[in-house]
Amino acid sequence: AIVLSPTRELAGQTFAVLRKIGKFHKFSAGLIIGGQNKNRKAEQNNDFQREQQSIPTTNILICTPGRLLQHLEQTPYFNVDAVQMLVLDEADRILDMGFRDQLVRILDYLPAQRQTLLFSATQTKDVKHLATLSINRKTVEYVGVHDQDDVVTPEQLKQSYVVVPIEHKLNCVYSFLKSHLKSKTIAFMATCF
């Protein structure tokens, strides 16, 4: 299986969870996300060589699109003909971050007969187009959380947003959470602190 994530951080989180549950199963997992330090060529080469050595012994690869494509193009004997499953985690973000061309090239390497799982928080035209590229139309099954509902947002859910200058963001979030300690709150932000 190959699991594609849009960022190194998300791939790392997925890998950490897989390691926790993996100890109860007989499969191996590998993380190929590229070097952390783009300024040190020697470290990048060492990371790449280490990844090359681990790929043949791995059942499940967790990777970023760019690094997977680099291995597909440069790692001798890296054969993906036996891949049975492709997981596109946060497919909308993969496309938003400019990996469309890389993704299309990756799909060209993979066997047509495979299971593809596409996870996306949004259903954009790009995500639907990606689904047509990567999924056999005869076997498409769309799972929507609110398919049968007239209204997607529950009536008792209160949604709001605040536009805050970046320098006040942390204080604003802290103040909001502190004043709503007894409430169930989810905060979505475009950037991390």
Describe each PLM feature range.
Residues 1-193:
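Conserved helicase RecA-like core
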